[in-house]
């Protein structure tokens, strides 16, 4: 029997990375919010790798932080090793990666959720979305509790009709032995949503006391590394850093896999879901890359106070006895004991082209989806969708302007645009290569790109916004100073001889004339820190300010070129397409284009052009049609204005009062 258990402004279903960001954003925007999760002990669970960040992913985390989200701050508190990746490459692809203590991460996020005003955390399994008149009205739990709200966000991760597979064994289960969400999957189908089926997996966890670290190569973190959060500044240098360890598969490893492929659900046809291309299982790697003699395997700590180690690169669904044989074939793991066995997990997802760029579903107003339910993989991708869904659900309740981030503004925009415009046939993972304007979308300038928008919405304020405003002012002031300061100094504080010697020491060409510091800094061999040695830079400039200044100066030409490309992109994005447009009336469109456009219903000409099957010729036809429609509407409006009744003619009313 159903009963009304509570009324809220926004309800979030699922307490993973997407759900936490969504619920926090909604509550921080003043909406009374309910977060329902299968187990409050598993809030912000990290069921797979104990790490945050990496190429593309660190950009998302910085953007979440710039919007006022929690993942960056929580990662900084829970980090046990931090490294900057791709330091030998340009700033567009440099990426921060943090090894985290899983328990610290979970506990920190749960404390934040429980301490957030206007946010209630409750344990329950949701089985039904209440839909009335095409709008979401709330949810119903397995026990019949009805929670009502005009906005619902579903962030169920990999739990929708999930099934775990190990060798020949399979059973209904979510990650880490949790319940699967079977009823909710059926309810989404009943509400007309198209669902697909994906697969992912996780490697075994092993006991560190059974490892021989002398046979592996240590991988240490960076000593002076920034944190993910702009608000918190640099990580505390007192935080403990622990090593990860590198080993490799062997010929024996590959032999064991090939001998047991007939016991792998991946190759026996038991697994039906599509797996992630960029995170394949070890058996898949050995088969697909048969010419490779070995594959890297990283042994990573799961926390400071546990003996569990994560074996990155060994995701598998092979039987348990085979998993042990595999691991014991690796150098350093000859006597290893497994604490938790690896497994594959199949789950349903909602085809994401059924969503608007706000992450609201097109079929049911007030219903938002975020995270792996939309076909993505990864904690960071989930959290990024979560904060956008949380903001937009709150804004819809408050009748505020929605937040739509374009692919020219953020990796979050790239992620969401790819999902809602192109869809995905495999678990979607973000990469820097997916962003056309990546030089403008660096991880170091996420705050300069997004924090002002978050401040206008009301998500960023106080010390966080003050720090951002100060950084912005300091960057501008330092850019202006470097542009007006000349060396050799006309006042003689830095002589010509000093400058030439300084340049020679750095292998840089001598000056033939006085030169602005900004020109000097454009030279690839000159760094901002070098200017301090010359006595022409402020040694107290914060590292984040110095990095931003250096990047803006060194890559000014490329950034300007990309800005011109962005301007063209935004021009097409500004050409809006009426929501009621009947594409069957647009003569000249190919049949495929008309079908795809009607199915996805893009909001702009720019988005239409990114739909698979829509050609440049189709876009040209669409532009002509939209222009003709605009002119007809203008003429119609003008005609109506010309026939408005006038007071002089007495047509506005002839009553005598």
From Swiss-Prot:
GO-annotated cellular components: cytosol
Residues bound to FAD: 14-19
Biased composition (Basic and acidic residues): 632-650
MF-aspect GO terms: flavin adenine dinucleotide binding
Cross-referenced Pfam families: GIDA, GIDA_C_1st, SAM_GIDA_C
Database matches in InterPro entries: FAD/NAD-bd_sf, GIDA_C_N, MnmG, MnmG-rel, MnmG-rel_CS, MnmG_C, MnmG_C_subdom, MnmG_C_subdom_sf
Gene Ontology biological-process annotations: tRNA methylation; tRNA wobble uridine modification
Cofactor(s) needed for function: FAD
Keyword vocabulary terms for this entry: Cytoplasm, FAD, Flavoprotein, NAD, tRNA processing
Reported function: NAD-binding protein involved in the addition of a carboxymethylaminomethyl (cmnm) group at the wobble position (U34) of certain tRNAs, forming tRNA-cmnm(5)s(2)U34.
HAMAP family cross-referenced by the UniProt entry: MnmG_GidA
Family: Belongs to the MnmG family.
Protein name (database record): tRNA uridine 5-carboxymethylaminomethyl modification enzyme MnmG
This protein's encoding gene: mnmG
């Amino acid at each position: 029997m159903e009963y009304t258990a509570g009324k809220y402004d926004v309800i979030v279903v699922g307490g993973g990375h997407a759900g936490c960001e969504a619920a926090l954003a909604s509550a921080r925007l003043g909406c009374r919010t309910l977060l329902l999760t299968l187990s409050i002990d598993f809030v912000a669970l990290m069921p797979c790798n104990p790490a945050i960040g990496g190429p593309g992913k660190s950009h998302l985390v910085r953007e979440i932080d710039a919007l006022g989200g929690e993942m960056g701050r929580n990662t900084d508190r829970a980090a046990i090793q931090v490294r900057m990746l791709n330091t030998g490459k340009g700033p567009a692809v440099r990426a921060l990666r943090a090894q985290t203590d899983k328990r610290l991460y979970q506990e920190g996020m749960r404390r934040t959720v429980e301490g957030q005003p206007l946010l209630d955390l409750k344990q329950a399994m949701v089985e039904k979305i209440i839909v009335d008149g095409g709008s979401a009205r709330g949810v119903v739990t397995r026990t019949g509790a009805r929670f009502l709200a005009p906005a619902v966000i579903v962030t169920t991760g990999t739990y929708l009709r999930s099934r775990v597979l190990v060798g020949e064994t399979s059973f209904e289960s979510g990650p880490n032995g949790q319940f699967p969400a079977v009823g909710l999957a059926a309810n989404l189908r009943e509400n007309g949503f198209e669902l697909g089926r994906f697969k992912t997996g996780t490697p075994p966890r092993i006991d560190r006391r059974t490892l021989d670290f002398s046979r592996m190569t240590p991988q240490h973190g960076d000593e002076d590394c920034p944190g993910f959060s702009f608000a918190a500044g640099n990580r505390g240098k007192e935080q403990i850093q622990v090593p990860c360890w590198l080993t490799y598969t062997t010929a024996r490893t590959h032999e064991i896999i090939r001998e047991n492929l007939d016991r792998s659900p991946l190759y026996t046809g038991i697994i039906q879901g599509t797996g992630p291309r960029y995170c394949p299982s070890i058996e898949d790697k050995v088969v697909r890359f048969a010419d490779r003699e070995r594959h890297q395997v990283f042994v990573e700590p799961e926390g400071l106070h546990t003996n569990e180690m994560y074996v990155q690169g060994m995701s598998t669904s092979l039987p348990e006895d085979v998993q042990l044989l595999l691991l014991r074939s690796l150098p350093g793991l000859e006597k290893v004991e497994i604490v938790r066995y690896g497994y594959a997990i199949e789950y349903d997802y909602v085809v994401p082209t059924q969503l608007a760029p706000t992450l609201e579903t097109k079929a049911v107003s007030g219903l938002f989806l975020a995270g792996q339910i939309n076909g993505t993989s990864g904690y960071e991708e989930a959290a990024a969708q979560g904060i956008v869904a949380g903001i937009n659900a709150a804004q819809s309740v408050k009748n505020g302007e929605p937040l739509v981030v374009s692919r020219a503004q953020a990796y979050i925009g790239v992620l969401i645009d790819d999902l809602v415009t192109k869809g995905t046939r495999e678990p979607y993972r973000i990469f820097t290569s997916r962003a056309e304007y990546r030089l403008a979308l660096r991880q170091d300038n996420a705050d300069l790109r997004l924090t002002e928008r978050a401040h206008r919405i009301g998500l960023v304020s106080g010390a966080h916004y003050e720090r951002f405003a100060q950084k912005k002012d300091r960057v501008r002031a330092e850019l202006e100073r470097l542009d007006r300061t000349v060396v050799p100094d006309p006042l003689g504080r830095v002589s010509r001889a000093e400058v030439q010697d300084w340049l020679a020491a750095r292998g840089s060409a001598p000056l033939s004339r006085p030169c602005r510091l900004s020109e000097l800094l454009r030279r690839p061999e000159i760094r901002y820190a070098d200017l301090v040695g010359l006595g022409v830079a402020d040694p107290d400039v914060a590292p984040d300010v110095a990095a931003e200044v250096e990047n803006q100066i060194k890559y000014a030409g490329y950034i300007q070129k990309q800005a011109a490309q962005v301007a063209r992109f935004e021009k097409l994005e500004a050409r809006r397409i009426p929501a009621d447009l009947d594409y069957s009336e647009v003569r000249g469109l190919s049949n495929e284009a008309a079908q795809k456009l009607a199915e996805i219903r893009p909001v702009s000409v720019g988005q239409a052009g990114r739909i698979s099957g829509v050609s440049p010729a189709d876009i040209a036809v669409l532009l002509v049609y939209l222009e003709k429609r605009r002119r007809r509407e203008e003429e119609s409006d003008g005609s109506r204005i010309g026939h408005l009744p006038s007071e002089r003619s007495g047509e506005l009313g002839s009553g005598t009062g």
